[in-house]
Swiss-Prot record:
EC number: 2.5.1.61
Role summary: Tetrapolymerization of the monopyrrole PBG into the hydroxymethylbilane pre-uroporphyrinogen in several discrete steps.
GO molecular function ontology, one term from the record: hydroxymethylbilane synthase activity
Cofactor: dipyrromethane
Pathway the protein contributes to: Porphyrin-containing compound metabolism; protoporphyrin-IX biosynthesis; coproporphyrinogen-III from 5-aminolevulinate: step 2/4
Encoding gene per record: hemC
Protein name, per record: Porphobilinogen deaminase
Matching Gene3D superfamilies: Periplasmic binding protein-like II, Porphobilinogen deaminase, C-terminal domain
Spans traversing the lipid bilayer: none
Disulphide connectivity of cysteines: none
Species, as recorded: Chromobacterium violaceum (strain ATCC 12472 / DSM 30191 / JCM 1249 / CCUG 213 / NBRC 12614 / NCIMB 9131 / NCTC 9757 / MK)
Quaternary structure and partners: Monomer.
Family, as annotated: Belongs to the HMBS family.
Sorted UniProt keywords: Porphyrin biosynthesis, Transferase
Chemical reaction(s) catalysed: 4 porphobilinogen + H2O = hydroxymethylbilane + 4 NH4(+)
Length: 309
């Protein structure tokens, strides 16, 4: 093998992520030519509706998977939080790279913290998960949908459409925009999405050669944490259409996982947590999901999915 092609969305953040993997591969394997195939996905094209209305985050992935299947690309680089909890047959996650900041970030030109926002202030977010947690903590705020790439969202804030917006801290930091962050929200304030802040590298399952090549990019601690998070989300049918959070930390071989399911209006927020050995990440995810189910997650999810949005 003397050449590898990386499939990537064409947004600045996605291209940064692809170029980051490109640079790491070239450093590991100087004889390799590593190219990037930029692609526009359905999720990038449909900007007038929230993700929960148009089919969810999988819309950012399908075209890249097609490029892998067609042989136009060898691997695809994704924000792991955008990758469906169950991959289509024939695909595999070859590596999960070391996580950037997993937290949500508060961005505003006028205020330092969410608690400073006056009643009626307009806060923009693309995520039902963030919306539900915002509404639960700050029912006096007006939460409005916010789509587009990072630069588009910041421009909408700067143009006065919003008093504040909530974005993933990792994306801002990767783009050199950390100075726009007024503060990161602790997981206790805004529980992140499963996989948030981590990059996943997807390949065709029959490419054992690539699996070995990519092994040095895999970060075991991040893989264990995100495996627990994704197992929880999978057990609950995780999608963009239901506010669902999952975040794990690892210390001394023990994983601690927190999970959340909520109604988008913040009227109901269910939380659960548990700890277990890192070697049993999937089982821990299922255990925390069961706690949420025992607390009423199934009827809550069914009610949310039945509501027109």
């Amino acid at each position: 093998m003397d050449k590898i092609v990386i499939a990537s969305r064409e947004s600045r953040l996605a291209m940064w992520q692809a170029e980051h993997i490109q640079a790491r591969l070239q450093a590991l394997y100087p004889h390799l030519t590593v190219e990037i195939l930029g692609m526009t996905t359905q999720g990038d094209q449909i900007l007038d509706k929230t993700l929960s209305k148009i089919g969810g985050k999988g819309l950012f992935v399908k075209e890249l998977e097609q490029a892998l299947m067609d042989g136009r690309a060898d691997l695809a680089v994704h924000s792991l939080k955008d990758v469906p909890m169950t991959l289509p047959d024939g695909f595999a996650l070859a590596a999960v790279c070391e996580r950037e900041d997993p937290r949500d970030a508060f961005v505003s030109n006028r205020y330092q913290h969410l608690s400073e926002l006056p009643a009626g202030s307009v806060v923009g977010t693309s995520s039902l998960r963030r919306e539900a947690q915002l509404r639960a903590r700050f029912p006096q705020l007006a939460v409005k949908p916010l789509r587009g790439n990072v630069q588009t969202r910041l421009k909408k804030l700067d143009d006065g459409e919003f008093d504040a917006i909530i974005l993933a801290a990792a994306g801002l930091k990767r783009l050199g925009l950390a100075e726009r962050i007024q503060g990161e929200l602790a997981p206790s304030e805004s529980l992140p999405a499963a996989g948030q802040g981590a990059l996943g590298i997807e390949i065709r399952a029959d490419r054992a050669d690539l699996s070995a090549l990519l092994a040095p990019l895999n970060h075991p601690d991040t893989r264990a944490c995100t495996a627990a998070e994704r197992a929880l989300a999978k057990e609950l049918g995780g999608s963009c259409q239901v506010p669902l959070g999952a975040f794990a930390t690892l210390a001394d071989g023990t994983l601690t996982l927190g999970g959340l399911v909520a109604h988008p209006d913040g009227s109901v927020v269910l939380t659960a947590s548990a700890s277990g050995p890192a070697d049993y990440a999937d089982a821990l995810g299922r255990a925390v999901a069961k706690k949420l189910i025992d607390a009423g997650a199934r009827p809550l999810i069914a009610a949310v999915l039945a509501e027109p949005r």
